[in-house]
Amino acid sequence: LKCVNLQANGIKMTQECAKEDNKCLTLRSLKKTLKFCASDRICKTMKIMSLPGEKITCCEGNMCNA
């Protein structure tokens, strides 16, 4: 997965997804929102050591939307 959008501490960086990777996965925590590009359409659940289980959802379009 390729990080497309990182929003933390008021800093926001956005980048377009490639045409073949236009499905986005969203990982949200209390202070930040991570956006990933994914070529598949399957939504998965990710668990990180320092965070509780986070729900990841897919969004359509060539840009990752909040």
Swiss-Prot record:
GO biological process, one term: defense response
UniProt-annotated location(s): Secreted
Expression by tissue: Expressed by the skin dorsal glands.
SS bond list: 3-24, 17-37, 43-58, 59-64
Transmembrane regions: none
One Gene Ontology cellular component: extracellular region
SUPFAM superfamilies on file: Snake toxin-like
UniProt keyword terms in alphabetical order: Amphibian defense peptide, Disulfide bond, Secreted
Top-level taxon: Eukaryota
Keyword Secreted assigned: yes
Function: Lacks alpha-neurotoxic activity, has apparently no antibacterial activity, nor anti-coagulant potency.
Protein name, as recorded: Xenoxin-2
Organism of derivation: Xenopus laevis
